[in-house]
Amino acid sequence: MSFTQPNLLFPPTVLSVGGLTQYIQTLLEQDEELMQVWVTGEVSSASQHRSGLFFTLQDPDERVALRCIVWASQLEKLSILPVPGEQVILLGRIRVYPQRGEYQLMVWQALPAGEGLMALRYRQLRDRLETEGLFDPARKRPLPPHPQTIAVVTSPQAAAWGDIQRTLSHRYPGLRVLLSPALVQGDQAPDSIVAAIERVEKDGRAEVLILSRGGGATEDMACFNHERVVRAIAECSIPVIAGIGHQRDESLADLVADVHVHTPTAAAQLAVPDLAELYTEHCQRLDHLITAGQTRLALAQNQLQHQNRRLKRLPLERQLVQEGRAIAHLKQQLIQTVSQQLQQRLTHQQLLAQKLQSLDPRAILQRGYAIARRQNGQILRTIAALQEGDDLTLQLSDGQVKVQVRKIMAAGTGHEAESEQMEL
């Protein structure tokens, strides 16, 4: 009994092992996707030879492995050296080895995965921007000593915004504070921060800019290491204070800013002087001026008395001639010295008087501000304790006005006394 297989089960040609391997090699090595491919995984083993580094890359959660090789001539070009147990990202191409019927990844570059990759990118960008001179101390600009308008770039919902407002109003009443709102976390934060800085530039009123946010995880601060944000700070026409709430590492925004501190409150303290401290300093200088004048006058009186005693001890005629010359010389010298000292003290006193006048709370009232008091004289600082019908007294620059509360509006429905939100 015979059995005949249908002809269709036997193709006209049958591939040899070499032919099949060559076919697979052609498919893999000529595939454009595999000529330059990025692969990530964990290094499970590594062996160093004269010809190069041989290691295995695998997925930690799966039983899948890929043999890899870095030729000796390429080792020095790697950003990191693959070490067993570490997560890496590899760049290379697929090569087939017919003798063993295997394929391998021929590696050109190795990068750290996860946080290691972020750190590598940070170092590379920092080095490039430093080479351009963006972090050069010579680029740093001094802060204005007495700014009248300050812009703040931060999130309106962030605690940093409240901290900055409270600090500025306490240290420098009457200061104009402009908020240019921005996202300070997430993928959209870099573009949002750049747009907020550009709005401040276009508005043109601010004399200094505070870029701030509260503390957070390292990944939350990534937007402050973005190249567009760094260049926007560098190109800003007014001094920039970076008040980013972190202690461990400096962001690139810190390095390029004119001044940087670690908290929003510290940034606000740095932006404006304390008026109370300025007044104390003025009083001290005035006391010093008065003391110096009194000391100079007492010295002149002592010199005059000394010359008078010498005059009495000389013969009359000779005494008159000598003392006349001495008195004339002393008089001329005294007049010149006192005149110079007096002119210097008067000029200094005028400067101090002008500064004191500019810091006088009454000058703030003359610019259109008012102080609201209850009937018992208590100053109102918030609407939270007000009720409709309450009687108030408004202190203006030239008198007082008795008013009654008819309607209470929250900050979003009216104008704030010391801060306003930019809608540009």
From Swiss-Prot:
Q: Name one GO biological process term.
A: DNA catabolic process
Keyword NADP listed? The answer is no
Keywords for the protein's UniProt record, in alphabetical order:
Cytoplasm, Exonuclease, Hydrolase, Nuclease
> One Pfam family this chain carries?
Exonuc_VII_L
Q: Which domain of life does the UniProt lineage start with?
A: Bacteria
Statement: the UniProt record of this protein carries the keyword Transcription: no
The record's HAMAP family line, in alphabetical order, gives: Exonuc_7_L
State how it assembles: Heterooligomer composed of large and small subunits.
Functional summary from the UniProt entry: Bidirectionally degrades single-stranded DNA into large acid-insoluble oligonucleotides, which are then degraded further into small acid-soluble oligonucleotides.
* Family designation: Belongs to the XseA family.
Spell out the protein name for this chain: Exodeoxyribonuclease 7 large subunit
Name the species this protein comes from. Cyanothece sp. (strain PCC 7425 / ATCC 29141)
